[in-house]
Amino acid sequence: MRLCLKCNTATLILQISTGPETRQISGPATSTQIRNFTLCQHLQGIHTHISSMVADLPSIATDVLSPYLAAIYDAACEPVTPLFKAMRDKLESCILQIHDQNFGADDADMDNNASSYMEELQRSILHFRKEFLSRLLPSAANANTAGTESICTRLTRQMASRVLIFYIRHASLVRPLSEWGKLRMAKDMAELELAVGQNLFPVEQLGAPYRALRAFRPLVFLETSQMGSSPLINDLPPSIVLHHLYTRGPDELESPMQKNRLSPKQYSLWLDNQREDQIWKGIKATLDDYAVKIRSRGDKEFSPVYPLMLQIGSSLTQENL
């Protein structure tokens, strides 16, 4: 069986295409992509079938076969993972356009349409669903074969979670944010939830990312004095709340992104690789700079966001003691 697994895996891997065409997401699925989809499904079918057989074997046999099963699973992921990465990059690119919008206007006419960047994101998700996910995701009847989540279902779930968190991250960085801007942002969040839920993955099943989206929407409408005691902040990463508070502070209270002259994309890449307590260190440095500016002028009054941000950040410090 072990030799057979090796031969079958090697033969199928050689058939996988890896060129640029496999990552295209702008047009219909190409014949090369469709062939890769078939290979993914075939390899996953082999993995599922053999896994069910191995479950009944002695543990010594399981130990021997496990590395080869892992190799089959990795091979099954290879034909589709670049496609999902390309789509994730596309959706992130759409979301980054939030920083090109004017959310600080006070007298803009409110309409029922989503922002232009959100409309582009919706179109992209709908196209991906129609041209790719319709071929990749299992039917409802086979959605959980042997209780195992399919590779493409897992990749779709991960992408949906990433889109929600990435959106909240960048929405929290928007500055300035007027009352009209809050309404526009809330509308965009509703459209995002609908697009992801209908075309990618049921948002209610995404757990923490979904709870964070649902918490951030009403959070932006709270008075600053209400935020410290609001249960909404329990469903949000502290960095999201802290970044949002910058928009409520004076211009001289610069965010780490502003202080370090980073683009939203650069700062986001940095955030991807940091823990919450590490992000707090960067935020604390800007609060210290702000305090120095205030004291150097002889002022004694700080913006209300200053003690609130220190309060939220101190909880991160205590958690890591």
What does each of the following model-derived ranges do?
Residues 1-321:
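Extended alpha-helical "rod" scaffolds
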